Design a protein with these regions (language model features):
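Hydrophobic residues in beta-strands of the RecA-like P-loop NTPase core, especially within AAA+ ATPase
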Residues: 158-159
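Short glycine-rich substrate-engagement loop in P-loop NTPases that contacts/grips substrate
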Residues: 74-80, 117-153, 165-172
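P-loop NTPase Walker A phosphate-binding motif
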Residues: 107-121
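Walker A/P-loop nucleotide-binding motif
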Residues: 91-109
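Interdomain "pre-motor" coupling segment immediately N-terminal to P-loop NTPase/helicase cores
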Residues: 15-59
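Pre-Walker A (pre-P-loop) alpha-helix and adjacent loop at the N terminus of AAA/AAA+ ATPase modules
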Residues: 59-95
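Loop/turn-to-beta-strand initiation segments
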Residues: 93, 121-122, 152-155, 185-191
Length: 215
């Protein structure tokens, strides 16, 4: 109804100024810059939301797989596999990318995030540190938007798990909430970390460990 009302008002204004025969130039030819088409959120609006979420987390500048193939690092053999994953139905909805600092994990996830945004998905990418600060803010303010950005995005990237402070009654509790809720809703989560499997088990409780390593 809102969509129809908008179109009616637009036509009325155009007619008022004698512009009913003038063709509008739209940024998005699919939804004609309305953000929705046939009651569904358009790809252009999803992209704009993803860009806002990325900017909020400090991940404005993404990479792409076309350039990645020209960049040599320890994860180069995985580029094609991860690019293919970006176009699947995400049956495996939690990916753990573990490795030492400097092997290219963040670069790879920037490529993946860009690929998914271009596919038309709402993507959120955050460092574990920034996410934990949002947990802390939510714990004090109960502003649900602070958690919903992690719960509701179609694909979530958590970068550098293990570098975040472990606040009592906050870090582990909310991290479990995010990972478990997304897993139940079959929403994919991609995690990068410098920790190996044994270190993950030492750092986090059994509930988080079992979901991260997908036991």
């Amino acid at each position: 109804q809102a969509e129809e009302k908008f179109l009616t008002e637009q036509k009325s204004i155009m007619k008022q100024y004698g512009l009913e025969n003038v063709k509008m130039a739209y940024s998005c030819p699919i939804c004609k810059d309305e953000g929705y088409k046939n009651g569904q959120m358009c790809k252009c609006l999803k992209k704009e939301i993803s860009n806002i979420l990325m900017k909020d987390s400090g991940f404005e500048n993404l990479e792409n797989f076309a350039n990645a193939t020209k960049t040599s690092n320890n994860l180069s053999p995985y580029y094609k596999k991860m690019q293919e994953w970006c176009h699947t139905d995400f049956k495996k909805n939690l990916l753990l990318l573990s490795g030492q600092t400097g092997v290219g994990k963040t670069y790879l996830t920037r490529c993946m995030a860009n690929e998914l945004i271009e596919r038309g998905l709402i993507v959120k990418m955050s460092t574990a540190f920034k996410m934990t600060q949002d947990f802390k803010s939510f714990h004090k303010s109960h502003n649900e938007e602070l958690l919903n950005q992690y719960l509701d995005c179609q694909v979530l990237f958590i970068d550098d798990l293990g570098t975040e402070p472990l606040y009592k009654d906050i870090t582990l509790e909310y991290l479990y909430l995010i990972i478990n809720e997304r897993k139940m809703r079959k929403l994919p989560t991609v995690i990068t970390t410098n920790l190996d499997i044994s270190q993950i088990r030492e750092t986090y409780d059994e509930r988080i460990y079992s979901r991260i390593v997908d036991r």
